[in-house]
């Protein structure tokens, strides 16, 4: 049964899961919605509160993460079109797979793949926990900036097949963390890059088909991950720790 479930997860591709061209359209609309905003100004206490392990908020260039779509805008309406489409066509198996990823950490997203040849070594777990701290700090800060409610809180017709999680919606923390981990792993295991990025895309899509995130939330999470990884690679402490994790793969 475990092998059957794993094959199910790996067999899901982003293309196969997309409802018509809607989700792709939502991503295209997000990228075409105008010049991204400058990183918001924050006070010193706010910056300290949003600091992670390797990164500090004031060091981040957040312009790659577009502002949340305005309520009632073309992008916002497309979000709900896609959400309703998924609500009508999602399967029990897809909802079950999405529920298995309610947590957001390395083991949830990539642990089953046993990329280290067995159980994840404690040092690797600690490394990804530290990276997760940077991801969480950044997405929580941006959620506080944009204050976009969850889709089911905005439209009573949205019926999630996942628990109605608390908190704000934009950007998706699950999407940001899954992609950030995938980018790191793809650098460590370049031959498996396509598989790793597809798994991150799948994890993001689970949040949409489950009814707890708008498509543009997940697209923004991915953009945030790209920005975070760019900054992480500039940090000597991160590079040193990444080198140590790379040695665990040999």
Where are these regions (language model features)?
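Hydrophobic alpha-helical bundle signature of multipass membrane enzymes
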Residues: 27-210, 237, 249-250
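Extracytoplasmic/periplasmic copper-protein system
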Residues: 245
């Amino acid at each position: 049964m475990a092998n059957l479930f794993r094959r199910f997860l790996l067999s899901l591709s982003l293309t196969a899961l997309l409802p018509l061209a809607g989700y792709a359209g939502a991503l295209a609309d997000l990228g075409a919605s105008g010049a991204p905003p400058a990183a918001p100004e924050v006070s010193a206490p706010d910056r300290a509160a949003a600091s992670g392990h390797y990164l500090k908020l004031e060091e981040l260039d957040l312009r790659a993460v577009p502002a949340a779509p305005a309520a009632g805008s073309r992008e916002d309406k497309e979000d709900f079109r896609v959400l309703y489409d998924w609500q009508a066509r999602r399967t029990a198996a897809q909802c079950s797979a999405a529920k298995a990823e309610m947590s957001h950490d390395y083991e949830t997203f990539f642990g089953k793949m046993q990329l280290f040849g067995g159980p994840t070594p404690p040092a690797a777990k600690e490394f990804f926990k530290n990276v997760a701290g940077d991801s969480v700090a950044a997405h929580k800060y941006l959620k506080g900036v944009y204050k976009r409610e969850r889709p089911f809180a905005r439209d009573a017709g949205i019926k999630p097949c996942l628990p109605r999680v608390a908190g704000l919606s934009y950007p998706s923390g699950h999407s940001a963390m899954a992609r950030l981990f995938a980018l790191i792993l793809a650098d460590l295991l370049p031959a498996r890059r396509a598989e790793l990025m597809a798994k991150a895309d799948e994890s993001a899509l689970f949040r949409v088909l489950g009814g707890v995130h708008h498509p543009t939330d997940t697209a923004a999470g991915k953009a945030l991950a790209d920005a975070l990884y760019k900054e992480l690679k500039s940090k000597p402490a991160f590079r040193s720790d990444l080198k140590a994790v790379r040695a665990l793969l040999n």
